[in-house]
Amino acid sequence: MRVLAIGAHPDDIEIACSGTLAKCVKRGDTVIVCHVSSGNLGHVVIPPDELRVIRANEAKKAGALAGIEVICAGFDDLEIYDNNKEARDKLVDIIKYANPDFIITHNPDDYMPDHTAVARLVFDASFTATLPNYESKYKEPAKLVPIYYMDTLAGVNFNPTEYVDITEEIDLKIEMLECHESQLVWMREHDGIDFADMVKTCSRYRGYQCGAEYAEGFRQCQVYLKGTTKRLLP
């Protein structure tokens, strides 16, 4: 299968679903990760132009650890919002390029505007990409595929309906997260937390819920034509 995970910033995917994506790669899937924005505002000291480059390199380093292709949509932080046609059209192109069998993205009820905007943009673009007469970079329309919403930060207001056992992938998940060195500093200085420890603890918590040592939780987008009778997550 082909899997597309779309996050707002570099590191969002590592936090919420990198264990699942690593497991997808292990079973033979092609996995593509897209960061819609550059993450250029996510630091206390490093200026945006410099941070943009740093975070792109951190994301590619993390993806390489698991054999994942990493691309960026090219927007900066807080430039993405849910009625932004430019952003929607860019995601249409990315979805057509990736040709996924399912998509993973943010939960629509999340803690910051870039996350909620991306959730809506992915919902809109995944349908728009299926329209043969909608003008875009790629001629062939995409398939209409299921969307899975990944966990929110610290699991706030998120009740999973599906779980993936990532016990064998937890060390890789944390290693991928730790590639984002700028964000470990940012979260410590901005939010006062040990980011890697928090993410591992949340994975442990989801594991308790489903009888695994470590797990990641998901909720499928339940709308007309996006349902499936198959288990797609690994």
Model-derived segments and their meaning:
Residues 1-98, 219, 231:
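Active-site rim/loop-helix segments in enzyme catalytic domains that contact anionic ligands
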